[in-house]
From Swiss-Prot:
The protein, known as: Pupal cuticle protein PCP52
Keywords recorded for this protein, A-Z: Cuticle, Signal
Region (Disordered): 166-195
Organism: Galleria mellonella (Greater wax moth)
Function: Component of the cuticle of the pupa of Galleria mellonella.
Secretion signal span: 1-15
Gene giving rise to this polypeptide: PCP52
GO terms of molecular function: structural constituent of cuticle
UniProt biased composition (Polar residues): 179-189
Length: 353
């Protein structure tokens, strides 16, 4: 390149006129250039390598710049995706806990409502009990004996005595062992005798109270009424020991020879055989489960009662039904159910209004 420039400069210098154009012509002399400057191939190759390196550096810098921009874009996109995922996860957790909170609030409200209902039922338990059964459950001692004495006891004032059966110690329930049954029967007989004596005293007191109530509400009783009351008292006194010992007598009947026919020879039957017992008054309300035939049955005599085995009404606590002649007097408070699965002792209780 330098050689070309230098050659052009020399040509221009030699071509320029140094005198007038149409003057004397002088011979042109061209000086001889001994050494023309030249460029070595190494310099040219070095320049080419230098240019190539510069181009490669520029291309590498551009590629690095593009790579950085691409990585930054990818990083920004990843950050946005992570941020969006975190936001969605946070919203999902908020929705979940909001649902759980709503569920617990509903459960708390339900428990509060149940507690209020239970409290209301507990505070109105007496009213609910009276609404279910508004009366006193009177269980006669002897089946199908309906007398004015027991009716008077049930229809007395709020402080009236009420007959209720209390459980005595259980006898032996193993019927497969005869010896153990006999031992338990003898023990039950002694306890039943004591219970029967106490029952007779309580029954006499109840009869006296009922008789006084009847005398205060009605006119003077006639001789027939007094005979009926006396007959009922003696029949109950004779029936209580037999009723409490009926189970033991049935178990040991084959050994002792005692039967219902032998009871008919008792001297108690003689003065009471002609005195029928008074039927149940029409004001009594029978419980559900009591057969109508038992209510409408004809009055029995003391002799027929003594000649037949004495039975007691039973109460099934699981099924809530009553069998036997059990009646309710309206207007009085109900008493608790009575279980007659074991030998029992009727006691005299008072139930306030």
């Amino acid at each position: 390149m330098r050689v070309l420039i230098l050659s052009a400069f020399i040509a221009c210098a030699t071509a320029a006129p140094s005198a007038p154009v149409f003057g004397t012509l002088t011979p042109l002399t061209v000086p001889y250039i001994a050494n023309i400057p030249t460029i070595s191939p190494g310099d040219i190759q070095a320049a080419a390598i230098d240019a190539k390196v510069k181009v490669e550096d520029a291309l590498r810098a551009a590629a690095d710049r593009n790579q950085e921009l691409l990585e930054q874009a990818i990083e920004n996109q990843n950050e946005k995706v992570i941020e969006v995922n975190d936001l969605l996860k946070e919203k999902s957790q908020e929705a979940f806990w909001s649902t759980e909170d709503t569920k617990w609030q509903a459960l708390t409200a339900l428990q509060t409502a149940e507690a209020k209902i239970d409290g209301t039922l507990a505070s109105n338990a007496d009213l609910l009990g009276k609404a279910v059964l508004n009366g006193v459950v009177v269980s006669p001692v002897v089946s199908r004996i309906y007398s004015n004495v027991i009716q008077g006891v049930a229809a007395a004032d709020c402080e009236t005595p009420v007959l209720k059966a209390a459980e005595a110690p259980e006898g032996n329930k193993d019927e497969g062992n005869k010896d153990s049954v006999q031992v338990e029967s003898s023990a039950t007989e002694s306890e039943s005798d004591k219970a029967a004596a106490g029952f007779v005293r309580n029954l006499e007191a109840a009869q006296a109270a009922a008789q006084a109530q009847l005398l205060s509400e009605t006119s003077a009783p006639t001789a027939d009424t007094r005979a009926v009351i006396a007959a009922s008292s003696e029949a109950s006194a004779a029936a209580a020991p037999a009723a409490s010992l009926s189970e033991a007598s049935a178990q040991s009947a084959s050994e002792t020879g005692v039967s219902a026919a032998s009871l008919s020879q008792s001297p108690v039957a003689t003065p009471l055989s002609a005195a029928p017992l008074a039927p149940l008054p029409s004001s009594s309300v029978p419980l559900a489960g009591v057969p109508a035939s038992a209510i409408a049955a004809a009055p029995l005599t003391a002799a027929s009662l003594i000649a037949s085995p004495l039975t007691l009404p039973t109460l099934n606590l699981e099924q809530q039904w009553v069998t036997g002649p059990v009646f309710v007097q309206p207007g009085l408070k109900a008493i608790s159910p009575i279980s007659l699965q074991t030998p029992f002792v009727p006691t005299l209780l008072k139930t306030p209004c």
